[in-house]
Amino acid sequence: MIKIENLKKQYGNNVVLKDISLNVKKGEAISVIGPSGSGKSTFLRCINGLEELSGGHICVDEFDLADKNLNIDKFREKVGMVFQNFNLFPHLTVLQNIILAPVTLKKVTKLEAIKLGKELLEKVGLLDKADVYPSSLSGGQKQRVAIARALAMKPEALLFDEPTSALDPEMVGEVLKVMKDLAKEGMTMIVVTHEMGFAREVCDRVIFMADGEIVEQGKPEEVFLNPQNERTQNFLKVLWKR
């Protein structure tokens, strides 16, 4: 479903992503782990078209990000993204945040969008918050709204950029539950995360990135219990000691 070939990204002389290739099957859930500064977030932003590629191809079904004639809005309908800091519009209510993109980009009628928005809020357990503003929500609630907003475009894949790292520990579980439910439903997901329990329990594959490269990948039990690369081994040793 997502095919990445020889992806490169650099800013001036700073090479952030080095010749990355990856195939993601429909319905596959992948966790991307690795130290800070390894290029994980830039990798996701490239997949979503938020960063211009310095080289290579990212194809989602028939769309190729390297195509100069690509309709980027149509591309982003296929691939949604959930950010670390929620990125909700503070001047809009929860429901208005969710229906904005379907109404403006997909030309869905407002009535249809409201119906869908309420269904999604019920899905993430926040229907009672439809008419409040983001400022009155907890961090966990904001992130669940952000997930509902991404789902409102009916994407075929979702990208999560450290969705729980800005949350208080007691709020992490409510967001992970929504993500686990999405994985069970067969949503294609690529998740940059430090939540190793989620990666082990929910994901089909774990990718370890370092220095802008995919250093190792495999099933969760392979990567976590028997890592082959020394950099993966050292990263996990530090992690388990915390």
Please describe what each predicted stretch is.
Residues 1-220:
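ABC family nucleotide-binding domain
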Residues 210, 217, 221-242:
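C-terminal boundary and immediately downstream tail of ABC-type ATPase nucleotide-binding domains
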